[in-house]
Amino acid sequence: MLPSCYNFLKEQHCQKASTQKGAEAAVKPLLALHHVVAVIQEIQLLAAVGEILQLEWLAEAVKLPSRYCC
């Protein structure tokens, strides 16, 4: 009786471990994809901020001649 209980528990443990490893393997690519999307969004945000700063600088550069002109 004891060996059959042991074998049953061992089998249950192995199935659970196998299922858990499979689930982790399936989730890892999704996490990697989420990370890539987050990095792309961060780059887009930095580009937008850079574009705004560039436009502000350009607006100031256009104003300069009128400030120092007669």
UniProtKB/Swiss-Prot annotation:
Pfam families found in the cross-reference section: bCoV_Orf14
Name recorded for this polypeptide: Uncharacterized protein 14
Top-level taxon of the source organism: Viruses
Other information: Bat coronavirus rp3 is highly similar to SARS-CoV (SARS-like).
Biological source species: Bat coronavirus Rp3/2004 (BtCoV/Rp3/2004)
InterPro entries xrefs: Protein_14_SARS-like (IPR035113)
